[in-house]
Regions:
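Membrane-interface amphipathic segments in extracytoplasmic regions
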Residues: 1-243
Length: 243
């Protein structure tokens, strides 16, 4: 999470947040990171009056980007080792595990056992979900994406979102709306390179029909909120480098 004198940014992983962070740190001198992937409910009261910015991504695309970002880089971390069953599961199996997080109590218990009781959000590359936080997914039937969305943002009606597929335009629109845009910021946003990308083919090529349908079930609330759909590669640009 980054706080400025104009707004607060809550960073949802794999949604273009590194790009947004770079813009904020470059153009807002008062900006400071107060916790890496810090949930909004932990926002200090002195910043509670500020507008909150977040970012979202098509859930089908999120799981592909997330998998190819954390594996094999974070193969030994608690979440990744749990997702991949110690490296024995590849994308389909790992994603199925993530989607069934709120329905498979035995596997949920195994993951909770690996997580800390408390999180020091000043640290990076550590488990940033507590045992108590993850307990809340039990019996909900939602997938990992929806769990993280709810955990980070809480009441999403109180948050302005940049959609990853139109990140630059949405970011400029938000900054204009709060009176924090300038010609220099607009030019920088439009001309800067992507950040923290994961190398993969179009997301649809990784899914079986059954797995794609499971995403639509487990992450239905977010999908319907933002109007996301599953697009085959033939109807979308084959982007090999997505943030």
């Amino acid at each position: 999470m980054i706080v400025t004198d104009k707004f607060v940014f809550v960073h949802f992983p794999r949604t273009g947040g590194t790009f947004i962070t770079d813009v904020i740190m470059k153009f807002f001198p008062a900006a400071q990171e107060i916790g890496y992937h810090l949930p909004r409910y932990l926002l200090p009261k002195e910043y509670s009056h500020l507008p909150v910015l977040g970012a979202v991504r098509n859930p089908w695309e999120f799981y592909v980007s997330w998998y190819y970002h954390v594996w094999p880089r974070d193969a030994a971390t608690p979440l990744t080792s749990w997702l991949t069953e110690n490296g024995t599961q590849q994308f389909k199996g790992a994603t199925r595990n993530a989607l069934n997080l709120g329905t498979d109590n035995d596997r949920l218990d195994a993951l909770i056992e690996k997580l800390p009781d408390e999180v020091d959000y000043r640290m990076r590359n550590i488990p940033n979900i507590t045992k108590d936080s993850l307990q809340k997914i039990r019996g909900t039937g939602v997938g990992y994406y929806t769990f993280r969305f709810n955990h980070l943002f809480g009441n999403a009606d109180e948050v302005s979102f940049c959609r990853q597929e139109r990140l630059r335009a949405d970011l400029i629109h938000f900054l204009e709306r709060i009176g924090a845009a300038s010609d220099e910021i607009r030019a920088h946003i439009l001309e800067s390179e992507k950040k923290n990308t994961a190398d993969h083919s179009h997301y649809s090529s990784y899914y079986t029909p059954e797995l794609a349908e499971l995403v639509s079930i487990r992450d239905r609330a977010v999908i319907e909120r933002f109007g996301y759909t599953f697009e085959p590669a033939s109807t979308a640009h084959n982007a090999n480098m997505n943030p």
